[in-house]
Every structure is written in structure tokens, then in C-alpha cells.
Amino acid sequence: MGDFLSDLQASPAEPPAEFTALPAMDSAAALAALNRLRPTLVIGAGGTGQQIVTYLKGLLTRRLGPKEWQGRVRLLAFDTAEETVSAKAADTDVQLEPNAEQFNIGNVPVPSIMQNIDGLDAIRERLGAILPTLPPVVLRSGAKQLRPFGLLSLLWNYKLVHDELRRAIWLLAGRQQHVTGNQEQGINIFICGSLVGGTGSGTFLDLAHLVRALFTELGSQAEFCHITGIGLLPQAFPGISGPNFLPNTAAALQELNHLMVKSGFKARFPDGRVIQSQEAPFNLFHIIDGVDERGQTWSDIGAVCQMVAEGLYL
């Protein structure tokens, strides 16, 4: 098998010129679209992931109605910063609902964790060697472009993340069985975010393996569930830079390549659960930059996130 990353290309895309002008469907068309829709969970990791998921909610609301799609599509966003993103739908600002779609996994007491690391087995095993090199600050406004802070935030808030993922997956699985009785349709999972920062880049692989582990609870239906990843590269952030943009991206892609090609993931989580898997975390992974096929750069990260949201909708 060849190197996984050698087969990947930054996905070119046309600007979503009609993103803000997509008309609402009539009721018959909306119902037909819903009946064709496979149960889908879209997970946003970090601020970029939250933007994508919010824009997707705007599209779903505009095209299918404010509530009609929620039995078939679940949206979750996990971020370490308390930021609100809005998308337009029928002249109305659409936002993710706090504590139902949008979850804050920040407010991590890093100094206290450092002092009590001996009693925190899951965190010590994953991050014990690197924690002393990190700034002893309470994470209240993002992961400081530090990937270990992203993973630490997920582990510190593990119960919240695990429970919300499980609730969404079981809702979609149960709903699908109730509607059609056909378990072979399975569930589509999309995990999206940037590879350049701390939260998304530090959590996307663990999120995928947590979802894989939760799939096993579905029995035979798990065979028909698929995970797709979407990661944004530094070029998707025109005019924005940071000292860790390139190192974070390189580290994230190296870890992704290792797990996709060689597989083999083992980690203990704070509830004592050990996930040991030989499966690749994703069935498919797309990397997205900020340049289209003509070599023109997208205007800003918001435009790129809108493009990704439209791709997910279509």
C-alpha cells in the first residue's frame, strides 16, 4: 500500500456564489429531499469546525425548514473558545444552540492538572511528558494554537464529548430503524476542522476513534457507518498566520498518515475505557486549501468554510 498522503490533493472548489441566495424548497421537494437523506452526523472541531457546522445549519434551514431536517441530521461543535458564529437563512441569523449543538470544552485548569497529574492516569499517559513544557494557564479562550492543549481539553471534558457523540449516534440509528426498518443504510459521520490550530488539530483523530468505538454498540449496523474527515490547511487562512500553523499541520498530517496507513491506535480515556483499534480512523479524508483551480485565493476563511458547508449539503 502506498503512502496515504501521496494520494491526497488539496481539494479545489468553485466559489459558492449562490451560498447566500439558495432558495427555500417547496414542501413537496423538501419532503422528497429528506426521504433521500441518509442519517448524518456532522462534528465540528475547534473554531473552524464550528464555522462550517453553523453555515451548514444555515443551508439546511434555508432549504429544508428550521426543524424538518433535525431527525435526519445532527450537528455538534466542540470548541475551547466561547465564540458565536452566525449564518443567514431567510433573512434570519442562524446560530448553533448552546449545550445542544455547540459545546464549550475550554475552561481547563491546566495548572491544577499539572499539580495533580499523578492521579489523572488518562492524561498522564497521553500528555505527561509534554505538560511541563506548556504554559500553566487556564484555557478560557482557545487552545493557544497548541495541539496538546486541544487534546487535553477533550480528555478533561471527555464525559461531555462522549455522551453527546453517543446520544447523537443512537438518535440517528434509532430514528432510521423506526422510519424504514433498514439498518443497512447506516450513518454518515463527517468530522471537520482546521489542521493549523490547537483544538481541531489536537482532537480530530481522537474524535474519529471515539466514534468508531461507539459504532461497535450498533451491532451489524456498524458495518454500514462511514467516517469522512475534512481538514483545512494554512492556505485556507489568507492574511492570517501564526508560529504554529505549519508545525501543527505537519504534525497532524504525519499522525493521520500513520493511522490511515499503518493503523494501530490505543489510548486510555478518563472513564477507564481503553480504545484499541486496528481500523483507520477515517474511511476518507479530504484536505482543503484556499486556492481554486485557477490559482486564485479565496477571500477569507469564512468563504472557505461556506464552501465546505455547501459541499457537505450537496
Put a short name on every predicted segment.
Residues 1-314:
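Tubulin/FtsZ superfamily GTPase core signature
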